[in-house]
From Swiss-Prot:
The keyword Glycoprotein appears for this protein: yes
Motif (Required for optimal activity): 293-295
Name recorded for this polypeptide: EGF domain-specific O-linked N-acetylglucosamine transferase
Leader sequence residues: 1-24
Position of sequence motif Prevents secretion from ER: 522-525
Localization terms from the record: Endoplasmic reticulum lumen
Top EC class for this record: transferase
EC number: 2.4.1.255
GO cellular component: endoplasmic reticulum lumen
Reaction(s) catalysed (UniProt annotation): L-seryl-[protein] + UDP-N-acetyl-alpha-D-glucosamine = 3-O-(N-acetyl-beta-D-glucosaminyl)-L-seryl-[protein] + UDP + H(+); L-threonyl-[protein] + UDP-N-acetyl-alpha-D-glucosamine = 3-O-(N-acetyl-beta-D-glucosaminyl)-L-threonyl-[protein] + UDP + H(+)
Superkingdom of origin: Eukaryota
Function text: Catalyzes the transfer of a single N-acetylglucosamine from UDP-GlcNAc to a serine or threonine residue in extracellular proteins resulting in their modification with a beta-linked N-acetylglucosamine (O-GlcNAc). Specifically glycosylates the Thr residue located between the fifth and sixth conserved cysteines of folded EGF-like domains.
Amino acid sequence: MVPLRLVLLLHIIHFSCENEVGSAANNGSAQLYNYRKIHLPDDHIPYYLHSNRHVAALCLQDLHCPYKQHLQNLNSCWGYEKTCAEGHRFGYPVCDQVDFGWAKTIEESQQVFWRQADFGYVKERLAETQILCRPQEQGDSMLACSQNLQHCRATNLYLDLRHPRRGQENFKEDFLQEGEIGGHCDLDKQALLSQGAWKSPLQSWFAELQSYSSFKFKPIEDAHCDIIIEKPTYFMKLDAGVNMYHHFCDFVNLYITQHVNNSFSTDINIVMWTTSVYGYGDLFSDTWKAFTDYEITHLKAYDNKRVCFKDAVFALLPRMRYGLFYNTPLISHCHGSGLFRAFSQHVLHRLNITQHPATEAKIRVTILVRSTEFRKILNLDELVQALEAVPTFQVKVVDYKYRVLGFLEQLSITHNSDIFIGMHGAGLTHLLFLPDWAVVFELYNCEDARCYLDLARLRGIQYMTWEKGDKVFPQDKGHHPNLGEHPKFTNYAFDVEEFLRLVQQGATYVSRHSKWPLRRTRDEL
């Protein structure tokens, strides 16, 4: 009998081959593959070829292959592949000192960070995957999941939505009953039910899959489907679509899921799994174009039907325990996740967001202001005037209101900033798309010190925040409607001289960064 791991591996390879680059057209004069479907940043191509040797082999034979220069770098690897040597990984974190709560040496600290928040995280999800419903013959179904059902893969999946139990809840736990989800395979029910320790709407797929059943019929072959979905389908349970911090936990985990499945194809369906009758407000919907060529489907579109999915993925979730990046317990004093840098590059490439060529030797300072009631900068005009008096600064003030400024335009402004300044708030999630040499300056963290510091560490860019408590001036003590006094619920003024000192400190960092296109010495600034 073929080992279970090999069965799973062969299926994943099949998933990649069939859907990533299309079928070969080996007639001597035509391209052997449609390489345009790969659609990755040029720097990512060697890593893709390492994991897809069948594409590399065809590229070697193909006179029309645009990636021949990358065939010299096939040792390059993301880090989670079994054939990956440590020295050829996409990147490796930097640790400035030891966090003795996690490690005893710098080297051990780097390993901890890499496992927590880099491609080591992908490696651990792959290693813990087990088959819960085993196919016995060609055409059978399969269910394979990581621990606690945080991520699953299914083939020939049967989903009976003829009796939808929809209401106002987004994630109703008894939405599916026995016999309404499953496949034709040998189910280890005990193993499946043992994975419920982390049962929670945005932490696990246990509520949705606990009733997975083993059927005597083959759903597709035996004509038990009203609809058959041929394309690979990614099921996602989404966090708040009106908050960039929370929604980008969805997108980051979708990108990680692509790595787990070794497929970056956009020829996929994405189904929003919700048991609610309502729609989903999404202020960042342009981002989906980086992952799919099609509109997002609401699960209720399949109501009153039996639907069969040939290939289905239950994506990693936005608020998983020890997940990325909402609940990440991150070791201190380390920074620079290759995974987050790759995510940033991937999304920017797919959305066609580029660096504008410099027209003058200035550091681009962008100040993000808030049109909400709280956390406004009371003396904004004074601060801007002080910055504009510095000849080497090019200053832009923006308010990322979605009705005024589209998200792609927002990303372009962010990506073309060298110093990005803003009050504590979800808008600072834009730091994910700053260039590598940039500084994010959280003007005041409102006593929430870790949130954007840790996100900046993950992205690998320099983080700053206000340092002197006697030089920031709150309007009042804050007035949360339920919690009472709270620093996030007031507005602030800042000492102009201290503000300018900090921005100039950030400018020095930018000017000395090896990747800054207009690198200057401190004296020139």
